[in-house]
């Protein structure tokens, strides 16, 4: 999600993308909810009734004491969790039973969230649309879309709202306390006292409206932000598969419905049903409130008591409880259809299969943790049974995104899924799955493989995340939603110790779990999916019939009312809001830049090395970058593949299984990334580099460097069968999910029309890379590819073209440098090669990547000035202003796209984009009319909108950075802390006159170097509607 471009994330059920890191059942929307005002006479439950008696704690000084009451909140439980250096406080509001979980931790990035258990009873998307409407104005802030308006009145590090399968959460985070209190007021008023205006329902949910609202004779169509969002979501096959897996393995309760909304069911939602749902499910007794960080929790308790909870009474919220799924007596098989993906593999291989098993109750914390570890042992890496038996035989494109263990639902699940396989291989997959389970149950696992999984988990506990508070919230939400013990769930070290103890006492511990949960489990779903070439046509026909059914019920009076309502909505959307009602920071609140540790530059064995001494929790982080600009064009195009497979091929001294085992036992893994970096001073040249990123516990640093040395000196590309499998999995991986990131691909496609560096970026990261890889593999033998990758490896790791960076603690720094020196001693040196290439700018052009999906992703890119040019911060402020004042109101609110915005990158490319957009040429026209709008609406650029736009930029500039990544901008771009502070100061000093000058200089006349790009369905009238020639990529 691009902050400021999209309102919410509807969380699709997908175990592999669980946040630790995200069908046509016809049920009438319930409209007979009981009014809660009649049941307020019951007394709040006691702590015993809630199953949470005061917890006995050790003698430690705490800010709040168990059993005491603070602003109406009784403190029920206090615990210190040493592994995360935090103290957990559990409060419960005595009048309503509302639980508040406060995490006190020395972390400047503070978090707040209001969570509700929202169980859908149909697929109209009611909880999802309510989430949107709640943020469209409230009693205290009767401003249309205060959420979007606060994006630029805040320096939040995160602001969003999310609808999951059975919950809705409203989280934000910020490092500024004034900002924190402002956003608390906005969010609390939004959820407890929203306006829920009917016209916001029409805008955000769905409406029947004339295609051209000013033409009474134009046909009636369905519009709406969520409606278009979900059309986009259901155009992605991976999402369709994940959603159907959830619906079919839990067929008896709320999970059988689509919480985000099925596009063909959304138009069945009535506005009154949504209002009634809010009264019941957003009651404080059904809420859970989370706060995290350094800020005073007593202020939060007082605010809740005085303004939102004291006039409420307890209600029994058992109506929202999710019961366990009744277990099946026989396994089930379900087959579904999907769209033909023209960017995917051949039609005969565009099939997917998943075998899913229902596991344990999510609230059984130790059991769920152990099943999670067991799942990793079964599927993770080349030493796991399923990888060996399902992936290495190479009859598929590898695991699909549903693979893994998930605790996102009341009952946890384990899934193994494959993508890009033939229908005739479904049977083979099932047979291999069964055989793998039986063999694992009988033979057990290699102890080192199990230990490598546990080590990786332990290392992740030490790894510091700048968004720890948000991560903790997202990891805990599902468990908390089912009344699980979220505090005990933080004691991961205890759970690991408990598991190790169980394994040591019973050598068949995991084997017995496999017998119980895998071999003898009848609650097993096999879901298969195959493409239907008529899938999109069938959806369009169903949508057309839905509209026709609704139109048949209309007489002339109702049709006239729809026309008039469309005009009223248009006026409603254009009306000016009194944003003075909203809180806003001042310049004094944000003037000081964040302080970062000093970077030291040393020449270590003739290698420029950046050193940062910083508290890293006993971890050393190492990055090294090799300039590869001198590679040939073909070799450069193969670098993304090279980066993907190099650590999976094995070395001279270790086969790939042994090497993977050593990596996981001693390090956090080796990540290879290709970087194309333009000169941020003048954008006249660029360089190409490959960066290796790894980290390890301090006591494993010698082994980390030894393994890195082994890999880059002795990697082998002689196993053609393994490489063939890795290549096919890689192509399958990059081909999946294009639509879900369609705006990013569209911006890359537009940039590729601006300059040759942009064209190369698209060939390395964009849709063009997918096409290149397919064609290259088709025309080149695997043996030849082995030879080409070996040649690349012999050229890339040149000590003369290397730079290094080490982030570690001050006390360990001498040891880290000593081990680093030994690592450098063995690296080959064969002279400096070409280190940069000149950038050439291109004539304007337009291109479309045709996709058989029902929405568009549009982009326009033009060259302006790079990061260190004096006008760059002005253009960055302008991009924020355009997003908030022009693009979002026109493209999102009025025209129905899910998201839209503008941005400028460090290379000086200024981009416009839209996301899940029902329009294409209409949106491109809006991009083109930017200058016209700016000149016609000069009054919009006032001191307040200027300051708000600066705050939007500060959200990005002042974002928290993990200890392991401090100094990354200098390492990649040679942007120093002094450069950064100068840039930040210039940005804050931008005036209205500066903006006006930038508007004239960069938008007053059409840029000499621009490009346009659309990802979306065929448009036969594209050239006619745009008056441009288009390159069409089918």
From Swiss-Prot:
Cellular component per GO, a single term: mitochondrial matrix
Cofactor note text: Binds 1 zinc ion per subunit.
Compartment annotation: Mitochondrion
Residues noted as binding Zn(2+) in the record, renumbered to the chain: 128, 132, 229
Disulfide bonds: none
Any one biological process term the GO annotation gives: proteolysis
Gene3D superfamilies: Metalloenzyme, LuxS/M16 peptidase-like (3.30.830.10)
Coiled-coil regions listed in the entry: none
Subunit and interaction comment: Homodimer.
Role according to the record: ATP-independent protease that degrades mitochondrial transit peptides after their cleavage. Also degrades other unstructured peptides.
Protein name: Presequence protease, mitochondrial
């Amino acid at each position: 999600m691009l902050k400021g471009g999209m309102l919410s994330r509807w969380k699709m059920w997908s175990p592999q993308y669980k946040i630790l890191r995200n069908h046509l059942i016809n049920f009438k929307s319930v409209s007979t909810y009981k009014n809660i005002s009649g049941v307020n006479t019951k007394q709040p439950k006691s702590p015993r009734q809630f199953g949470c008696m005061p917890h006995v704690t050790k003698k430690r000084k705490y800010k709040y004491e168990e059993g005491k009451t603070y602003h109406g909140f009784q403190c029920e439980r206090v615990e210190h969790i040493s592994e995360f250096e935090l103290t957990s406080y559990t409060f419960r509001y005595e009048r309503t039973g509302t639980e508040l979980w406060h995490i006190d931790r020395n972390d400047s990035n503070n978090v707040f969230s209001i969570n509700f258990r929202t169980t859908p009873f149909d697929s109209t998307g009611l909880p999802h649309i309510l989430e949107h409407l709640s943020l469209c104005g409230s009693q205290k802030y009767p401003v249309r879309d205060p959420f979007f308006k606060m994006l630029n009145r805040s320096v939040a590090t995160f602001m969003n709202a999310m609808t999951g399968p059975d919950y809705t959460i409203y989280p934000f985070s910020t490092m500024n306390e004034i900002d924190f209190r402002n956003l608390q007021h906005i969010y609390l008023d939004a959820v407890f006292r929203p306006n829920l205006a009917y016209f916001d329902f029409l805008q955000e949910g769905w409406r029947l409206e004339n295609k051209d609202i000013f033409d009474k004779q134009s046909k009636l169509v369905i519009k709406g932000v969520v409606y278009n969002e979900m059309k986009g979501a259901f155009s992605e096959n991976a999402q369709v598969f994940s959603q159907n897996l959830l619906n079919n393995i839990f067929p008896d309760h709320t999970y059988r419905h689509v919480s985000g909304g099925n596009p063909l069911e959304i138009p069945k939602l009535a506005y009154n049903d949504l209002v009634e749902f809010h009264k019941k499910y957003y009651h404080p007794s059904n809420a859970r409130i989370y706060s995290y960080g350094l800020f005073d929790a007593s202020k939060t308790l007082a605010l809740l008591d005085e303004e939102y909870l004291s006039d409420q009474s307890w209600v029994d919220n058992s109506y929202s409880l999710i019961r366990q799924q009744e277990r099946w007596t026989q396994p089930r098989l379900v087959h579904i259809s999907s769209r033909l993906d023209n960017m995917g593999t051949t039609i005969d291989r565009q099939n997917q299969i998943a075998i899913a098993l229902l596991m344990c109750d999510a609230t059984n914390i130790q059991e769920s943790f152990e099943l999670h570890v067991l799942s990793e042992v079964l599927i993770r890496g080349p030493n796991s049974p399923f990888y060996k038996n399902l992936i290495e035989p190479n009859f598929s494109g590898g695991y699909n995104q549903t693979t893994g263990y998930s605790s996102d639902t009341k009952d946890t699940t384990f899934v193994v899924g494959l993508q890009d396989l033939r229908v005739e291989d479904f049977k083979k997959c099932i047979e291999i799955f069964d055989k793998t389970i039986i063999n694992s149950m009988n033979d057990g696992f290699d102890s080192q493989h199990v230990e490598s999984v546990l080590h990786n988990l332990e290392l992740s506990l030490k790894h510091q995340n700048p968004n720890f508070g948000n991560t903790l919230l997202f990891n805990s939400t599902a468990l908390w939603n089912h009344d699980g013990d979220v505090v005990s769930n933080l004691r991961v070290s205890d759970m690991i110790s408990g598991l190790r103890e169980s394994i040591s006492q019973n050598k068949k511990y995991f084997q017995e779990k496999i017998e119980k949960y895998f071999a003898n489990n009848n609650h097993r779903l096999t879901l298969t999916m195959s493409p239907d070439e008529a899938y999109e046509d069938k959806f369009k026909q169903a949508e057309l019939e839905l509209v026709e059914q609704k139109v048949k019920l209309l007489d002339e009076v109702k049709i006239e009312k729809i026309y008039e309502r469309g005009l009223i909505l248009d006026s409603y959307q254009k009306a000016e809001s009194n944003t003075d009602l909203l809180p806003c920071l001042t310049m004094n609140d944000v003037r000081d830049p964040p302080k970062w540790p000093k970077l030291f530059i040393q020449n270590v064995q003739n290698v420029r090395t950046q050193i940062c001494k910083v508290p890293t929790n006993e971890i050393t982080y190492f990055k090294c970058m090799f300039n590869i600009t001198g590679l040939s064009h073909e070799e450069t195009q193969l670098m993304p593949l090279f980066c993907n497979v190099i650590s999976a091929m094995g070395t001279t001294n270790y086969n790939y299984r042994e090497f993977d085992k050593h990596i996981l036992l001693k390090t956090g893994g080796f990540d290879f990334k290709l970087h194309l970096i333009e000169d941020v001073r003048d954008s006249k040249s660029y360089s190409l580099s490959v960066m290796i990123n790894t980290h390890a516990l301090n006591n494993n640093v010698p082994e980390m460097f030894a393994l890195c040395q082994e890999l880059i000196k002795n990697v082998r590309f002689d196993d053609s069968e393994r490489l063939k499998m890795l290549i096919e999995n890689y192509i399958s991986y990059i081909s999946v999910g294009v639509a879900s990131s369609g705006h990013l691909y569209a911006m890359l496609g537009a940039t590729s029309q601006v300059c040759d560096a942009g064209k190369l970026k698209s060939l390395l990261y964009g849709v063009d890379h997918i096409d290149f890889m397919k064609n290259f593999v088709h025309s080149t033998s695997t043996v030849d590819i082995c030879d080409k990758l070996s040649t690349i490896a012999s050229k890339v790791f040149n000590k003369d073209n290397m730079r290094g960076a080490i982030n570690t603690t001050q006390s360990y720094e001498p040891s880290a440098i000593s081990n680093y020196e030994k690592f450098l001693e063995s690296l080959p040196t064969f002279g400096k090669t070409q280190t940069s290439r000149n950038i050439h700018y291109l004539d304007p052009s337009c291109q479309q990547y045709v996709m058989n999906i029902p929405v568009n992703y549009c982009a326009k890119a033009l060259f302006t000035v790079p990061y260190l040019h004096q006008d760059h911060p002005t253009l960055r402020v302008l991009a924020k202003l355009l997003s908030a004042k022009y693009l979002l109101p026109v493209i999102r609110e009025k025209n129905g796209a899910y998201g839209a915005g503008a941005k400028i990158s460090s290379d000086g490319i200024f981009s416009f984009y839209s996301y899940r957009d029902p329009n294409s040429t209409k949106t491109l026209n809006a991009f083109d009319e930017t200058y016209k709008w700016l000149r016609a609406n000069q009054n919009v650029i006032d001191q307040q909108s200027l300051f708000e736009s600066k705050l939007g930029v500060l959200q990005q500039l002042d974002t928290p950075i993990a200890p392991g990544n401090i100094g990354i901008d200098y390492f990649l771009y040679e942007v120093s802390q002094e450069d950064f502070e100068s840039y930040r100061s210039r940005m804050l000093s931008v005036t209205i006159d500066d903006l006006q000058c930038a508007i004239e200089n960069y938008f007053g006349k059409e840029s000499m170097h621009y490009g346009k790009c659309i990802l979306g369905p065929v448009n036969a009238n594209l050239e006619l509607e745009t008056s441009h020639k288009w390159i069409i990529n089918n």
